[in-house]
């Protein structure tokens, strides 16, 4: 569960290391975001020479959360960290590589490019 002011690791090679959630997209009163949800965030930590700089406002999709999520078959999935992938305006990932596993929920939300780049889909 990601909300405003949540800090997330960045799971791609855009140059950002950490982002801070500004807003959860998808409704005026929406408070929490889970795997596959899109947020607006600002870059808090970045490496020199990357595609994004500290202070940039970006859109990102959540790929891992610490909070467990119940699936339709009754199983639960949770990860060791909160992580996101930075997106372009058309919904494709801005980076060319994805690090670490991603949730299967991204397939339901039509983030096929992220699914294909990810080393593992859980």
Curated annotation (Swiss-Prot):
Record-level Gene Ontology MF annotations: large ribosomal subunit rRNA binding; structural constituent of ribosome
What keywords appear on the UniProt entry? Ribonucleoprotein, Ribosomal protein, RNA-binding, rRNA-binding
Question: InterPro entries, per this entry?
Answer: Ribosomal_uL14, Ribosomal_uL14_bac-type, Ribosomal_uL14_CS, Ribosomal_uL14_sf
Q: Which Pfam families match?
A: Ribosomal_L14
- Tell me which PANTHER family the record gives: 50S/60S RIBOSOMAL PROTEIN L14/L23, LARGE RIBOSOMAL SUBUNIT PROTEIN UL14M
Function comment: Binds to 23S rRNA. Forms part of two intersubunit bridges in the 70S ribosome.
Provide the protein name. Answer: Large ribosomal subunit protein uL14
Q: Which gene encodes it?
A: rplN
């Amino acid at each position: 569960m990601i909300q405003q002011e949540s800090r997330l690791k960045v799971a791609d090679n855009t140059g950002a290391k950490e982002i801070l959630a500004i807003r959860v997209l998808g409704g005026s009163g929406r408070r929490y975001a889970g795997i596959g949800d899109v947020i607006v965030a600002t870059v808090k930590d970045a490496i020199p020479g990357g595609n994004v700089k500290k202070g940039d406002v970006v859109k990102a999709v959540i790929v891992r959360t610490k909070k467990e999520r119940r699936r339709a078959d009754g199983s639960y999935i949770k990860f060791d960290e909160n992580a996101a992938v930075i997106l372009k305006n058309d919904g494709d990932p801005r980076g060319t590589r994805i690090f670490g596993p991603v949730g299967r929920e991204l397939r339901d939300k039509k983030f096929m490019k992220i699914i294909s780049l990810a080393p593992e889909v859980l």
